[in-house]
Amino acid sequence: MFGELQKPHVLVLGLGESGLAMARWCGLNGCAVRVADTREAPANLVFLQAELMSAEFVGGPFAESLLDGIGLVAISPGLSPLEANTGELLAAARQRGIPVWGEIELFARALAHLQAESGYAPKVLAITGTNGKTTTTALTGRLVERAGKSVAVAGNISPSALDKLSACIASATLPDVWVLELSSFQLETTHTLAPHAATVLNVTQDHLDWHGSMEAYAASKARIFGPAGTACVQVLNRNDRLTMDMARPGTAPVTFGTDLPETPGSFGVLREGGMPWLVLAEPDSEAEGEGKPRRRKADATAQEAVPVRHKRLMPADALHIRGMHNATNAMAALALCRAIDLPLNALLHGLREYRGEPHRVEWVATIDEVEYFDDSKGTNVGATVAALSGLDKRVVLIAGGEGKGQDFSPLAAPVAQYARAVVLIGRAAGELRDALQGSGASLVDAATLEEAVNKAAELAEGGDVVLLSPACASLDMFRNYVHRAEVFRSAVEELALSRGIMP
């Protein structure tokens, strides 16, 4: 289970969901376990003590003595190597020659062990990106199931990959396909995972406090395709330069985007008669040798482009998930599933059935011809840009919160194009106001989210959308993004009742 390491004494850093899962897994597989957390009494300590009584727990700042007798460090994804205390401990581990793995590396080693021991060789599909990970992961899992395969969905989406693997082993229900949502934090400490197909949906600024730079952030995302030389089908967003830069030399990635696809097997959008269609590019044998113009090759090879025709799959409006950004998520999911040869017709049936994930451009209510949408999961600038562009309607935007040191200037253009007004909340309200000052949208402050909903309702006109898409984290005003969404929905319900409408 641990590669060349034989049941090492494991130091688990951090006791969140992933840390607890790693401690459980290592203990279950015969390792002595020491767990360290900078908190003296983390919430999961009670579960650790109940489930793994032999584990040693050390609370408080990390000290180098934690490494004494240790053969493997298993680090939780929330711990940044740039944080001084964590960074010093990791440097000391490297100096002692102690490997540092994350949960997904433990998962990858476990799959390799199971294949060697019993021949278990599932397909693995992996998904990352700044925005759209959870929707694409959940949708991919649904499509795999609709195509008749048993599937396990895990990772950043929860449950943890190791907890899910343990449960599958215990119940003798190992799946045909694993669908993994992976964050940049998880990928940073993943070394041997080799998925059959993987996608980076997009890369926009986020978590720079954790990674230190956009270059480091993008490099972590690119680790999803596995070690150099592994045969992973790359599924790339051709509308995103940073993801297309990840194409491996000499390979032809599958691409998706909101334009027409130009390479066989890629997905895109055909606009016909004012209606956008999802389409698949197929080789056009009739075009061979007829002197028809060649399409520009979009992949990384220097081979001559293959003429393609565009097969209509379904109108984008037939999707229950709203917005063109969700259409791109759907195309990424289709591409991943086709990479493991799942039948297209079954996948399209599943696509029509999928109704989306909570708090991701989720419709809440229609009040006096104004629609209210909850995109509380939009915790960065890129997510809000995607929501504004994807809805393609006049919007009153509610934005603000904990800014995380982001540059808000990329919001100015879509706000100018789509927003009637922006209601500003939270700690970053002033920074947002500065960034949007010249956009032409009315900028209004609100002290609370409830006040923001009422002000947005006053500003909106019939046919508009009131969109909560904060472009910020929630912790300055709320417990988390789910709590923020609950407050928003409650405020919308109160607004409906005040106007004599049953929500």
From Swiss-Prot:
Enzyme Commission code: 6.3.2.9
Pathways per UniProt: Cell wall biogenesis; peptidoglycan biosynthesis
Record: residues binding ATP: 129-135
First-listed, main subcellular location of the protein, grouped into a coarse class: cytoplasm
Assigned GO CC terms: cytoplasm
GO BP field: cell division; cell wall organization; peptidoglycan biosynthetic process; regulation of cell shape
Keyword Cell membrane: no
InterPro entries xref list: Folylpolyglutamate_synth_CS, Mur-like_cat_sf, Mur_ligase_C, Mur_ligase_C_dom_sf, Mur_ligase_cen, MurD
EC class (word): ligase
Reactions catalysed, as given in the entry: UDP-N-acetyl-alpha-D-muramoyl-L-alanine + D-glutamate + ATP = UDP-N-acetyl-alpha-D-muramoyl-L-alanyl-D-glutamate + ADP + phosphate + H(+)
Subcellular compartments: Cytoplasm
Molecular function terms, GO-annotated: ATP binding; tetrahydrofolylpolyglutamate synthase activity; UDP-N-acetylmuramoylalanine-D-glutamate ligase activity
Domain of life: Bacteria
Pfam families: Mur_ligase_C (PF02875), Mur_ligase_M (PF08245), MurD-like_N (PF21799)
Keywords from the UniProt entry: ATP-binding, Cell cycle, Cell division, Cell shape, Cell wall biogenesis/degradation, Cytoplasm, Ligase, Nucleotide-binding, Peptidoglycan synthesis
Disordered: annotated span: 284-305
Family: Belongs to the MurCDEF family.
Function text: Cell wall formation. Catalyzes the addition of glutamate to the nucleotide precursor UDP-N-acetylmuramoyl-L-alanine (UMA).
Record-given protein name: UDP-N-acetylmuramoylalanine--D-glutamate ligase
Gene (UniProt): murD
